């Protein structure tokens, strides 16, 4: 992330699952959209108390409006830079993304993403969780119906595809 970048959208309680054959489970994290990057942060320095409050606010926000281009108080560009120091978090330049789309499922709205990172082709789906079961493993039990269109369009409008 560059120092002049600004956060354009910040989504929490995002469940990411691989679309590869035989993949099991997923990861919870944040999708953060900046001027030039899409990041998936699942190792954050943010406090648990903040996370719990902001996920509840996000659910209320999505009940009122389905728009995914939202930003949450309490997390800024400097915190994103700090989180991206952890190499487990993923930062994509828009041109790394070979395919981006969204789909409405019966159970919720899904963002589908294909990209190449470190010479490896990856394919994931992302959905925003509303409720969770915590035992025996943390997993979503209910997903939100949201409008991924402005989020996807923001990325598509800024890509310079050279392939």
Where do the model's predicted regions map?
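The phosphoinositide-binding surface of pleckstrin homology
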Residues: 1-25
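Acidic, Ser/Thr- and proline-rich intrinsically disordered linker/docking segments
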Residues: 2-4, 26-28, 39-163
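Broad, structure-driven detector of short, well-ordered beta-strand segments within folded domains
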Residues: 29-33
């Amino acid at each position: 992330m560059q120092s002049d970048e600004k956060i354009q959208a910040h989504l929490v309680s995002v469940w990411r699952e691989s679309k590869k054959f035989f993949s099991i489970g997923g990861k919870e994290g944040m999708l953060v959209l900046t001027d030039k990057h899409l990041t998936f942060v699942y190792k954050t320095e943010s406090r648990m108390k903040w996370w719990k409050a902001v996920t509840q606010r996000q659910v209320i926000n999505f009940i009122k409006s389905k728009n995914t281009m939202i930003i949450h108080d309490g997390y800024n560009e400097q915190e994103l830079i700090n989180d991206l120091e952890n190499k487990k978090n993923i930062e994509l330049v828009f041109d790394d993304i070979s395919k981006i789309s969204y789909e409405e499922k019966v159970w919720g709205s899904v963002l589908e993403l294909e990209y190449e990172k470190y010479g490896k082709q990856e394919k994931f789906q992302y959905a925003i969780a509303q409720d969770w079961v915590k035992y025996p493993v943390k997993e979503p039990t209910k997903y939100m119906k949201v409008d991924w269109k402005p989020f996807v369009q923001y990325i598509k409008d800024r890509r310079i595809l050279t392939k």
